[in-house]
């Protein structure tokens, strides 16, 4: 009998986890890919550095989040408005939310009304907000040096800085 309750509890937990999908634009914004970023994740007092690469893959975008040694932490494909696991890494809802929030931050001002139609967002010089539900919102702050500060949760923020790849050359 307790096995049934455990199965019901796990099913309910799965439904709750799947119910909140990150807000995504329809269709994807016009961005020049690939993009590479240095990411600093601030979770309370802890700060973690990582690298994020966004690249075109067929008709979708591959998001690869790597630790400083280049080990993948999350890999997701965004295609047809849906996230899909890419490779052997399991789906990571926190990574998906970060990727979706960064996509909102990177969307050009001129495309916001079209791509986020029907969503509760506002934009002002140096700042942008997207309300997710009655109790949460993504806050975006733009620094003059090109850095982006994303606040995606009560104690979870990201500092995102574009990496300059103009001097890189192919082997």
Q: What are these language model-derived features?
A:
Residues 14-17:
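C-terminal motif of bacterial Sec signal peptides marking the signal peptidase cleavage site
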Residues 57, 78-82:
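Short acidic-glycine loop/turn motifs at beta-strand connectors
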Residues 1-8:
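Bacterial N-terminal signal peptides that target proteins for export
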Residues 52-74:
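N-terminal, post-signal-peptide region of Sec/Tat-exported proteins
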Residues 65, 76-77, 129-131:
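Hydrophobic beta-strand positions
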Residues 19-21, 37-40, 45, 50-53, ...:
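Mature, soluble, non-transmembrane domains
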Residues 23-33:
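Short, low-complexity, disordered segments immediately C-terminal to signal peptides
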């Amino acid at each position: 009998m307790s096995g049934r309750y455990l199965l019901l509890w796990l099913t309910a937990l799965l439904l709750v986890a799947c119910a909140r999908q990150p807000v995504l634009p329809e269709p994807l914004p016009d961005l020049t890919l690939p993009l590479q970023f240095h990411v600093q994740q601030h979770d309370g007092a802890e700060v973690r550095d990582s690298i994020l690469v966004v690249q075109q893959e067929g008709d979708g975008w591959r998001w690869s989040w790597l630790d400083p040694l280049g080990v993948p932490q999350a890999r997701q494909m965004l295609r047809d408005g849906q996230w899909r696991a890419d490779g052997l890494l399991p789906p990571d809802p926190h990574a998906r939310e970060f990727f979706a929030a960064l996509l909102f931050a990177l969307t050009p001002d001129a495309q916001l009304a079209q791509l986020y139609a029907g969503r509760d967002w506002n934009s002002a010089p140096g700042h942008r907000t997207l309300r997710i539900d009655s109790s949460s919102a993504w806050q975006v702050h733009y620094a003059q040096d090109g850095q982006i500060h994303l606040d995606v949760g009560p104690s979870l923020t990201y500092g995102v800085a574009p990496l300059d790849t103009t001097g890189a050359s192919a082997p």
